[in-house]
């Protein structure tokens, strides 16, 4: 009754790709998975001010490739690339293999569920009224072309004695349509009254080409831009 499956999990292999891309030998899967979780926790803690949206981990033969999706790549890279070099060394030490770090910029953070959730949590921790924070985030997303967005808050909203759940939605968020590109994220706001949980669903349109279309777009985004020929 009223229980909802994780929108990302149900779409894996249909219109969503895995965040960890590798195969493990027999008996090594648990260690690699635990190592992935440790690396993610380390990166999220180290880059908590860099507006990190997603971290993808790939493990080709005897090395690793980590792609960090962020709205503020300058903070991740640091002055003359010093921060990203230090990050690469630390992660390589944790994983025990050479690591290559890619930085991808999120051009529209208002349409990224993880960044929207972080933004709402930041406002709640600064004591902005929760309804105002929700409404502002929803309006920004719709203004930039989202098909629909829903934000749900749970906890002692406004310092109330009894915890409750409130949500706000604009547009359409078709959770039952598997070809729908639903970006889903959760985050926690630590306020003086306690923890407030934030959930965000962003509908970005339908993907008719399936997972192949998603992977083709990812490769296109990662490909280096062609060099422009100078005018004579």
UniProtKB/Swiss-Prot annotation:
It holds the Pfam family KH_2. Residues 39-107 form the KH type-2 domain. GO terms for molecular function: mRNA binding; rRNA binding; structural constituent of ribosome. The keyword Secreted does not apply. GO terms for cellular component: cytosolic small ribosomal subunit. Keywords: Ribonucleoprotein, Ribosomal protein, RNA-binding, rRNA-binding. PROSITE patterns: KH_TYPE_2 (PS50823), RIBOSOMAL_S3 (PS00548). GO terms for biological process: translation. Part of the 30S ribosomal subunit. Forms a tight complex with proteins S10 and S14. Binds the lower part of the 30S subunit head. Binds mRNA in the 70S ribosome, positioning it for translation. Belongs to the universal ribosomal protein uS3 family. NCBIfam families: rpsC_bact. This is Small ribosomal subunit protein uS3.
